[in-house]
Amino acid sequence: MARYNVLLWDKDNDLYETIISTDNRETAETVANSLNKFVHQDRLLSMNNREPFDAVYIEDRMYKEDNLEYIEYKD
């Protein structure tokens, strides 16, 4: 069974913060798309450096292989 993690990416520190972990792809996509609106508006700040996050990813963890799926990168 696949496990989907929704991650926020802090480019400056190359850190990922997991927001939710679920076995439901639709739930992961809904959360990622909702978060992406806030990331695009610079409204979600990294706890590490208090700077806005740079992107939202869905991590598909199936058979212990990590696969980061790019949602959107803000310019």
Stretches with model-predicted labels:
Residues M1, D14, E26, E51-F53, ...:
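Compositionally biased, low-complexity intrinsically disordered regions
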Residues M1-T18, L45-M47:
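Short aromatic-glycine-(Arg/Gly/Cys) micro-motifs in beta-strand/loop hairpins
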Residues W9, T18-I20, P52, E59:
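Generic ordered-secondary-structure signal
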Residues D14-T30:
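A short, exposed loop/beta-hairpin motif centered on an aromatic-Gly-Thr core
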Residues S34-D75:
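Short, mixed-charge low-complexity intrinsically disordered segments
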